[in-house]
Structure formats: C-alpha cells, structure tokens
A protein has these predicted regions:
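Ligand-site clamp/hinge motif
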Residues: 219-222, 249-296, 423-429, 437-439, ...
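A structural "hinge/loop" feature
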Residues: 48-54, 67-88, 110, 137, ...
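Alpha-helical secondary-structure segments
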Residues: 64, 140-147, 179-185, 229-230, ...
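Gly/Pro-rich hinge or "lid" segments in bacterial periplasmic/extracellular proteins
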Residues: 91, 101-105, 199-258, 262, ...
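Detector for C-terminal structural segments
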Residues: 26-30, 46-47, 237, 241, ...
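Surface-exposed binding/hinge segments that line
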Residues: 58, 126, 162-210
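Extracellular/periplasmic solute-recognition and catalytic clefts
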Residues: 19-20, 151, 157-160, 174, ...
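N-terminal lobe/hinge region of extracytoplasmic solute-binding protein
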Residues: 39-40, 46-51, 61-118, 149, ...
Length: 571
C-alpha cells in the first residue's frame, strides 16, 4: 500500500527555492544548477530546430492546472511519496520503465520489453534506445541500476521502500548487461512488475556521486530537475508554480512531443479562490475540487466536470494500545454504531462509495457484494460492548469497564479538513447513543502526524486520515504485527492470522489462487477492525470546455497530460 500524501499529509519542504511565496527560483548561486541548466537550454534549442512545431491546431499554447498543494520534494523520486509529485515524475518530467493501460495492465514505456525467468527470480528489462535526458545525455541501463540501488538503500530513506521487500537489495540485486539491458533479482511474489510503474528513473550521470542520505537536500528535486520525459522543467517558484515546456525530442514511438508548448502547475491553497479562478478562465484544470463545488462547475458556462472512481479512502484508525480500544469487539461496535452510508452521502454528495477494507473498487480482487461489510446496527453494537465488559455503571450515559475506565475516546483530525471534522463530529453524536464518549480534536497536520507516526509518542486514541492506495495492495506496513513500531503501523495491530494472510498474499502470483485468500483476509480484517473505513472518493476535475485530449481514470489525474491541448483561438 503506497502512502501518498496529496492532498492528505503535507510534508515540509526541505530544499525551498525561495523564502517567500512566488519568489523567483534561486539558481544563480547553486553550482549544480549553474552547471546543468545551460545544457538543458542547449538541448531545447537543438531539439526545437530538429523537431519544429507541426502544423496542427492542437500543437502549441499554454495550459494551467491548479490545486491546493505543492509537489513535495518535487522530482526527487527517492524522497517523497506525495501523490502530486509522483504523478509529475511518472507522467510529466520523468519516465518509469512501464506504465498501465486503460485496463490497468502493464505496457512498455522506457522499457520496450521485458522477460522473467521460469522461477520468477530474475527480471530483465530491455530499454528504448531513443530516450534522452534533457541535457542531451542518453538514458541507459546504468540509470535504472542507480535508481534501484538508491531505492533499496536504507540510507536514502525512500518512503516507499517496502514496495521492494521481495526484491534483492543492493549490488547483488541488479546487473547492467549493456547500455540497454538491465537485470534485477527478486523473490517470487504477486504483481512483481507494479513497483516499476511507480518508480521514475533518475539520471546517474548527475546524481551518482551524491550520498544516499543527501539526496533529500539536493537541488535536483526542487531547483533544477533534469528529466527525460515529455515535459522539460523550466522554473519552480516555491508554493506558487511549476513551469514545464513540451519536449520536442520525446520519442515518436511514444507519441512524440506533447501538444502543449507550456504546461503550468499552480498552487492555490484556498479552494474557493481556486474555483473562482477556474470560472474566470485563469485556470484551465482545477484538480480535485470539493464535491460541494461540483454543481457550480457543472452549471457554469465554459466549464465541465469530469469524475472517475479513484484510489483514496478515508478512515478513522484506532490505537489498539489504548485500554478502551484493545478489544476488537469495541472497535467493531464503533463501526456498527456509525452510519457510514449517511456520512458518505453527506460529504461526497454521490461522488464516491462506502469503503469496508483497503481493496478499492478498481482492484481485481474487490468483492462487489461486500459480503463481510459491517452494517449500521446500534443494537448489535450495544450487545458487543456489553459482551466486552463495558457498561454504564454510574448512570451518566457513558460506559465503563470493571476497572472504572470510561469508554471515552479522542479523535484527531487535521486543521482545514472539513470532511474529517464532520466525520469526527458525526461520530461524537452517533456513538453517544451507544454509550461511547467522543471528543474531536483538531491539530496542524505536521503535529498530528508526529503524534501518530512516532513510536515513542502515539498519545492518541483515534485519527481521521486518508491513504491513496496502489494497484498492488499490500497492507503489511499498516497491519502486520512486525510493523507495530513503524510509522504506518500506528494501530498496533497484533493478529497472527492476519499476519499469515498478508504474508501469503504477498507471494501468491496466480490471481485465481489468491481470490479466496483475499476473501478470508477481508473477513479477518473486518473482525479485527483496526480502521473504521468510511469511503472511497471519486476524483473530480473541473476543466475548461475548450481543453481537448483530457481523460481521467484511477491511474491518475495527469495520465493523459501528453494529449492535452488548447485551441489556437485563445493562445
């Protein structure tokens, strides 16, 4: 399960390019940027001369997208799990070895082909020979090997390092056969190609001498990234905008240069302001408007709304270390005493669906019947609490256990997130009806995450939060007992059968053989109830009517960015 923060968990920028919002990029005094950016300019000049703009109305012009969050750590692939940043790494500035088609099946991208040996222990990629870094240097197998070595090196601190658990780390795990061939070694496991869909390849010739622990602070990520993808980096103004230029030399076999001459990503922290900018025409694509803004976009002249089932799900995670929450019956009672369908309808306004586990509706193992889902049933919730030894012993309406501990819980949510505030407030009202006292508490996101993720702290009962799931669902980092002292294992779940099922699912290659195991996993997870799952969101996009080539699905908001175009009439 990939933990992606956009727009869920903001991470502090550690290599800012300007001290104030919108300040010009500071590259003049940075030796790395001073060296590489002139080479990028020369590459662009030569590429434009060799590949002039085609005489087609779709080519040229500027398109502006906007959303509320920065691209945390920018193009430094190995130091961020930010959703917006990884989308730009995959689809805008850099390239992955493979991507997914509309049916979520692997297809060639930087790698033109691959094969795996019979026992699934060696995977060989064959790279395209026509992909250049934006300084004119060819992309080779050495870049792939370098990126892999850094991704599997614990000194790097790669947030998605668990994705590579079943690969052989370090130099023993990768071999450069020639400039266009690289072999990696692995242990047989499910969906072994999926990590290569998300890991954009970095330039070894620019970063190979940088110590793994220094990559986070390196200017490459935020000041002067040199990619090899369809768009060339031009400028970053901190907390304001990123500007990219279409790459004239992007391979014809991959569609050639993008239609757009200039692509701009803007940061507009206030969603009301962002909506007004879309309606006024100063923004072409508003990424992830709130559901309560959808109707305004639909009703306004010149704009349209696009929606698709997506991968983020919202939940309240429970700290099972607390005496009030240690018994799974209490956690099940909490979920059954909460009308999650009412919550989803009130918040999503029809743009989403109730969640019951980490398996998203687009996942191949998703059960459309949701056989193990807990229904809204306050009577059964009361019975479970009685059975667990929690009764109202003093008549004040709040249950206690035999030691006199009140069934009182505090739910944290992050400042500025109205949806999670509403969830906590609705739970406060509904759980009171079964004898549970709830106190919502708002915190700044960084402070909240410090409490929840730090094994030395974890002074909390429940937390309203969200994850963006990946196509390869592996909940080991969330619920495996071995991860209870790791940042994402904050629930402290200890269930031997759940551990066994997660270990088994990770290595079953055949999907049909895995289906019954997934079913049992969902059943046990429902009984354990480490999270009260609320809903999967649809991704919404507000778009100007005259923007062409736009499509949206669970792969991401920028999956079709190479095909976006604007008419000549407004250039």
């Amino acid at each position: 399960m990939k933990k992606a923060w956009f727009p869920l968990l903001p991470v502090l920028l550690t290599a800012c390019v300007g001290g104030e919002r919108g300040a010009p990029p500071v590259v003049a005094n940075d030796p790395f940027c001073q060296e590489v950016m002139p080479r990028v300019e020369a590459f662009l000049e030569g590429a434009r001369a060799e590949h002039p703009l085609p005489d087609d109305e779709r080519y040229g012009g500027t398109l502006v997208t906007a959303t509320i969050g920065e691209l945390t750590q920018g193009m430094m692939v190995l130091t961020t799990a930010d959703h917006g940043a990884t989308q730009h790494q995959q689809f805008v500035n850099l390239m992955t070895l493979l991507d997914y088609d509309e049916a979520f099946q692997p297809r060639p991208y930087l790698a033109e082909s691959w094969e795996v040996n019979d026992d699934l222990t060696e995977l060989t990629f064959h790279l395209r020979g026509d992909v250049l870094w934006h300084d004119g240097t060819p992309t080779t197998a050495r870049d792939v090997a370098f990126t892999y070595l850094r991704a599997t090196d614990p000194r790097t601190g790669f947030p998605n390092a668990p994705y590579w658990t079943h690969y052989v780390p370090g130099p023993e795990g990768v071999e450069v056969v020639d400039d266009r061939t690289v072999k990696v070694r692995l242990h047989p496991h499910a969906d072994y190609l999926d990590p290569w869909r998300t890991l954009a390849i970095l330039p070894e010739h620019l970063l190979g001498e940088v110590a793994p622990e220094l990559l986070r602070e390196h200017p490459y990520g935020l000041r002067c990234p040199v990619g090899n993808g369809p768009f060339v980096f031009r400028e970053h103004r901190d907390q304001d905008r990123w500007t990219f230029t279409g790459n004239p030399a992007f391979p014809e076999g991959l569609g050639g240069r993008p239609y757009l001459e200039t692509y701009v990503y803007r940061v507009v922290p206030d969603q009301s302001t962002l909506l007004n900018e879309l309606l006024a025409g100063s923004v072409d694509v508003y990424v992830a408007p709130r559901p309560d803004q959808a109707q305004q976009i639909l009703d306004a002249p010149g704009t349209r709304l696009v929606s698709a089932p997506f991968r983020d799900f919202v939940f309240v995670g429970w700290n099972a270390r607390r005496p009030q929450l240690a018994d799974a019956r209490v956690r099940r009672a909490i979920t059954m005493a909460t009308d999650r369908h009412q919550v989803a309808e009130a918040i999503l306004l029809g743009y989403g669906r109730v969640a019951n586990s980490t398996l998203m509706p687009v996942h191949w193992a998703y059960d459309p019947e949701q056989r193990f889902a807990l229904s809204y049933d306050p009577a059964t919730a009361r019975a479970l609490l009685d059975e667990a030894g929690w009764t109202d012993r003093d008549g004040d309406g709040v249950r206690e256990n035999g030691d006199g501990v009140r069934l009182s819980i505090e739910i944290l949510y992050n400042q500025g997130n109205q949806a999670r505030k509403r969830i906590a407030e609705i739970m406060q009202v509904q759980l009171r009806e079964v004898g549970i006292e709830v106190t919502p508490r708002v915190l700044e996101m960084g402070a909240l995450w410090d409490i929840v993720s730090n094994p030395a702290d974890r002074d909390f009962d429940g937390v309203a939060i969200a994850w963006v799931g990946e196509f390869r669902v592996d909940d080991t980092g969330l619920f495996h007992s071995s991860q209870a002292d790791e940042p994402f294992g904050f629930t402290g779940t200890h269930n031997p059968e759940l551990d066994h099922l997660m270990d088994t699912l990770a290595v079953i290659v055949d999907r049909e053989a895995a289906r019954p195991v997934w079913a049992r996993y969902e059943e046990v997870l429902t009984d354990e109830q480490p999270y009260t799952f609320f809903y999967f969101l649809d991704r919404l996009m507000g778009i100007r009517d005259d923007v062409g080539g736009f499509s949206l699905d669970a792969r991401g908001e920028w999956v079709s960015v190479r095909d976006w175009w604007v008419p000549r009439s407004r250039r």
